[in-house]
Amino acid sequence: MPKDKLKTIYVCNQCGETSPRWLGRCPSCGAWNTMTEDVVAEPAKSSSGRAAAPVRVTGQTSLKPLKLKNVSTTEEKSRIVTGIAELDRVLGGGIVLGSVILIGGEPGIGKSTILLQLCGEVSRTRSVLYVTGEESVRQIKLRAVRLDVPQDNISIVAESDVDEICGLIEQMKPDLVVIDSIQTMRCTDVASSSGTVSQVKESSARFLNVAKTNEIPTFIVGHVNKDGAIAGPKVMEHIVDTVLYFEGDKTLPYRVLRAVKNRYGSTNEIGMFDMTGKGLEQIENPSQVMLEGRPIGISGTCVACVMEGTRPVMSAIQALVTKTAFPSPRRTASGFDYNRMYLLLAVLEKRAGYVFGNQDVYINIIGGLKLDETACDLPVCLAMASSLLDLPVPEKTLAIGEVGLGGEVRSVPHLENRLREAQRVGFDTAIVPKHNLNMLDAAQFPGLRLVGVAYLREAINAIKINK
């Protein structure tokens, strides 16, 4: 019988497009430098040279479909509450049975730490299997001792053979499985090394099949590439149920867990953690943490209140506007949309009369948050105007509102929740859209002065930073 031949192909790790030769740019998705080498088996032709005969449909099958009405949807039975409230929030209330959850993040950000702590919490009442392909069993033990993780119901195995691991899962039937990491796993019947597109794709598919068949929730750790996306084919993110990103500056203790895909919950929720010597600790009051250490009495700072899912979070926005010596001024934004910053600068120039053409502009969101909500437009504009005029925004004043191209301040959703959070934290003045204010009862917020503005110029005058 003829054997399969091996051939080298190049696969785009963004869209999965294949090519017989290397290309600098993927012809399908247009991404640059994403074609990676892979080795696949090419089926050999028969001695007669004929194509394989088509599969004959017999009309017989062993499949037994269920009536949809008979499928159990009881929440208590379909989810596992982890005991880590911030993680449960991001997942939509707990881990769904049989779900496959992919978690990615930069090296050293804390992926293995949070999963080991998760195993410890779940193991209090259930059995857990932790599979490591990167560390030895002894190394995992040392970390578990440092984190003070319960160890009675946690089984650990150092293995990278996917078929062996799947067989072990079928045999043990644990209540939770952790695979750390998918880039170290390999299928022996796939003719390529670990971490290649073919290996990652096939390994993910086999783990998915075992998880769905046995209703065992499975966490898979994925490495990220230089652009911050999870390394490997995009099909891996498509087939899993949930994709989580663990974000944060490694020089700071704060970590943010964010869902970019979630079949069983919202993708707008975030979980916040503090990295300590004893592992990750939950941050139950993120607004207070985000505002800690913000400069007082210095120009260029304005406080915003953003909605992260159902949770309002206060965040300090910093702007630095300085005169440039070069013909092309520099624009930099960290944690805020770069193109949105350009739009707001244009509105400030056209509608408010400020000149930024000879100024470098830098925007930074304190605490490592990424603000993509249009309700941050007004505080960003006020921060830039404050820095340009070198006049500080009052310490206990926050701003909420979307800014249109005409300089108008547009209404935002969930304003009541934002104002309650501002009141709880201790702010005394809130600059809000006038349209929103007309529909609010100011008596609900004693001690918080509400200032309604219809245009950007009114907001600047309201906080008295206009010369």
Predicted segments with their positions:
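Peripheral, non-AAA+ core regions of ATP-driven protein-machinery
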Residues: 4-14, 18-89, 96-102, 109-120, ...
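P-loop (Walker A) phosphate-binding loop of NTP-binding proteins
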Residues: 106, 133
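Conserved RecA-like ASCE P-loop NTPase motor core of nucleic-acid helicases/translocases
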Residues: 128-132
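Divalent metal-dependent catalytic cores for phosphoryl transfer on phosphate-bearing substrates
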Residues: 137
